[in-house]
């Protein structure tokens, strides 16, 4: 029987990111993917600032940013604009980049790290005991692993086999998707139009193709199995935007109903779920791929500690505690966007737009929404009495001639102090940054969030609490 430390089910962005996070720490990982190959066409296309920061912290952002199309403003309602340039980050934007590009970059990194990605492997059974998990595959073979993570999408086999409830609802509004070429493309990048008949959106991929998205109320009774034609998508744009922008070729199309659901649990014993297997929602706000990648970043270092034998039980428990709350907030955010844009009552939609326009003219409210949309504002729970920085995203500060996120690319914990200090460990990076506004010492988790902040005298105990027993000394100092 083939045995690995962790079996990841699903080779989408969540599964690939998780595999990279595990393999870079020496964990034996195998990815089981039901599809025979990675697709070139996909529904997701937006990467937000926090996701780009995390990719940067693993040296995978540059290629995606170079090939993507930056969007610096988002208008959730007419007259209400979120200026993403205000975000305190190196990536003040939402980057239009097809999921297929992100998957190719992640897949290449996984291959460099020696990850075994097995295609055509469908999971049909799961059993676990106190030592590990056995997966049964459709071809009759089995896969044994210390831990299993289901990153296998909204119809997750892993979640189903665990018996985890996927609570929520299906939206009633049909969504039409098509990748098209335009003879008269809009000049304003991301282009959205609304009317009483629905909403249309054009997303530039930067290679001559555009993603055309339509919520057309006149076509809500069309069967989901009915193919989307070029004439149908053109008619929707003409009816709602009064132009079809000269739509010509169409290489792909789809019709679907989106859902708003979240798994009640993200873990059962040695088995976890992440990404769309744990949460699905309206595509408005472009949160899905981002939330999944961030799930993987949160879980990866924790699982690696468990495999290494020095993770205390609370470390693995914290994955569900932290990410379930984030997933619930994402569902609330996207459901709000859905009601604002696609609600059936014209009066209610109009009232919501008036309210959101007024609220976004209040700087504090606007910055809060920008933080939620971009992921910059995510904060994990902090213990009572902990420093206010605890649980917050650590900014990409300058550290001795380089950047913090560059120092984090080996996936270790990082101690940020105002002066050089030897903490006697090789598995923790020490970075020097002088800032009167920061505490004397800050311990940054591998996923870029503050684990602890306080006085240097407490460092040894704190590092031992988070990282396990002491390792041989030779930790680099920058």
Segments (PLM) and residue ranges:
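Core Rossmann-like FAD-binding/catalytic domain of the broad FAD-dependent monooxygenase superfamily
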Residues: 1-350, 356-360, 368, 477-478
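Hydrophobic, well-ordered secondary-structure elements that form the walls
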Residues: 19, 415, 448
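Short, internal strand/loop/helix patches
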Residues: 149, 424-438
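Short, hydrophobic beta-strand segments that form beta-sheet elements in well-ordered domains
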Residues: 176-179, 413-419, 429-433
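Short loop/turn microsegments at loop-to-beta-strand junctions
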Residues: 269, 438-440
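Short, glycine-anchored, charge-dense loop/turn motifs used at functional sites
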Residues: 278, 441-451
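C-terminal helical "tail/cap" subdomain of flavin- and related membrane-associated enzymes
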Residues: 302-413, 417-423, 439, 451-457, ...
């Amino acid at each position: 029987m083939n045995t690995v430390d962790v079996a990841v089910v699903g080779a989408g962005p969540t599964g690939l990111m998780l595999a990279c996070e595990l393999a870079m720490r020496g964990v034996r990982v195998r990815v089981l993917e039901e599809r025979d190959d990675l697709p070139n066409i996909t529904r997701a296309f937006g990467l937000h600032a926090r996701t780009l920061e995390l990719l940067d912290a693993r040296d995978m952002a540059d290629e995606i940013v170079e090939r993507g199309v930056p969007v610096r403003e988002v208008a959730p309602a007419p007259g209400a604009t979120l200026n993403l340039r205000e975000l305190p980050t190196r990536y003040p934007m939402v980057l239009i980049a097809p999921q297929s590009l992100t998957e190719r970059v992640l897949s290449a990194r996984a291959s460099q790290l020696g990850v075994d990605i097995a295609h055509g492997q469908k999971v049909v059974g799961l059993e676990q005991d106190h030592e590990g998990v056995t997966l049964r595959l459709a071809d009759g073979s089995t896969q044994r692993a210390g831990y299993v993570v289901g990153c296998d999408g909204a119809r997750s086999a892993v979640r189903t086999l665990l018996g985890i409830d996927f609570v929520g609802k299906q939206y009633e509004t049909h969504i039409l998707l098509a990748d098209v070429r335009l003879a008269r493309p809009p000049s304003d990048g991301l282009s959205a139009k609304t009317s009483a008949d629905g909403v249309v959106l054009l997303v530039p991929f930067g290679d001559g193709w555009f993603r055309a998205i339509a919520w057309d109320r006149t076509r809500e009774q069309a069967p989901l199995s009915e193919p989307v034609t070029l004439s149908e998508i053109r008619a929707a744009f003409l009816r709602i935007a009064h132009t079809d922008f000269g739509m010509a070729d169409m290489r792909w199309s789809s019709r679907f109903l989106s859902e708003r659901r979240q798994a009640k649990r993200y873990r059962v014993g040695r088995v976890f779920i992440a990404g769309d297997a744990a949460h699905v929602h309206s595509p408005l706000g472009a949160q899905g791929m981002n939330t999944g990648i961030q799930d993987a970043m949160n879980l990866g270092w924790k699982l690696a500690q468990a495999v290494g034998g020095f993770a205390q039980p609370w470390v693995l428990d914290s994955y569900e505690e932290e990410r379930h709350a984030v997933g619930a907030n994402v569902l609330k955010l996207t459901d709000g966007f859905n009601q604002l844009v696609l609600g059936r009552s014209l009066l209610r939609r109009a009232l919501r737009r008036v309210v959101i326009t007024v609220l976004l003219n209040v700087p504090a409210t606007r910055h809060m929404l920008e933080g939620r949309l971009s992921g910059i504002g995510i904060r994990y729970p902090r213990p009572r009495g902990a420093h206010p920085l605890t649980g917050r995203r650590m900014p990409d500060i300058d550290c001795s001639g380089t950047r913090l996120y560059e120092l984090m690319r080996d996936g270790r914990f990082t101690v940020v102090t105002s002066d050089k200090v030897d903490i006697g460990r090789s598995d923790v990076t020490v970075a020097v940054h002088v800032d009167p506004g920061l505490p004397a010492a800050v311990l940054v988790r591998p996923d870029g969030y503050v684990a602890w902040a306080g006085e240097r005298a407490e460092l040894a105990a704190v590092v031992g609490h988070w990282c396990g027993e002491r390792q041989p000394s030779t930790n680099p100092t920058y």
